[in-house]
């Protein structure tokens, strides 16, 4: 996802693989994702050592979740420390597409299958990974996952307070090399809509698990 956006200007993205968007990553992680996607795409149709052709495509997961997700575990533990309350940091209208990890794995299997077909349309292209998971804010999605575990919705933390915390955390990262989940970058992207409407159902014959 971050090979495309959200960009450093905080512009929302609602569209598919061919939607025009100002791709201007503002963080080293997003920049590296963009560079890797360009390298993989460029390698398509190249000749490898044994004279065979190499075919490539790129897959873009949009917020992976599922079994073994350490980030979800961290959020859950934070909620339990606050009396099973989730204090919100994200605007409700900042909608994000999410994808189950099993769908991402299955898309990789299907990509390997269909990229070998003569005349395959997926060669040299990039596709968002998708499923049947609801599109909503990060906070609301996490609440959907954790409500059966007894987590309740709390109040929203004021934006000025969040900005103060992110500035403090960014300074700690610079001075002491101590990273934090909440920083200026994560605050911006989580509060910027990124909703992908995918085309890979027809190209991959994909039927998602979730």
Swiss-Prot record:
| InterPro entries hit by this protein | 3Beta_OHSteriod_DH/Estase, NAD(P)-bd_dom_sf
Question: Record-annotated residues binding NAD(+)?
Answer: 33
Entry annotated with the keyword Oxidoreductase: yes
Q: What induces it?
A: Expressed in the early phase of the viral replicative cycle.
Superkingdom per UniProt: Viruses
Pathway recorded for this protein: Lipid metabolism; steroid biosynthesis
Catalytic function, reaction form: a 3beta-hydroxy-Delta(5)-steroid + NAD(+) = a 3-oxo-Delta(5)-steroid + NADH + H(+); a 3-oxo-Delta(5)-steroid = a 3-oxo-Delta(4)-steroid
Name the Gene Ontology molecular function terms of this record.
3-beta-hydroxy-Delta5-steroid dehydrogenase (NAD+) activity; steroid Delta-isomerase activity
The answer to whether UniProt assigns keyword Hydrolase to this entry is no
Q: What does this protein do?
A: Catalyzes the oxidative conversion of Delta(5)-ene-3-beta-hydroxy steroid, and the oxidative conversion of ketosteroids. The 3-beta-HSD enzymatic system plays a crucial role in the biosynthesis of all classes of hormonal steroids. During viral infection, steroid production contributes to virulence by inhibiting the host inflammatory response.
Q: What is this protein called?
A: 3 beta-hydroxysteroid dehydrogenase/Delta 5-->4-isomerase
Q: Which organism is it from?
A: Variola virus (isolate Human/India/Ind3/1967)
Q: Which gene encodes it?
A: OPG174
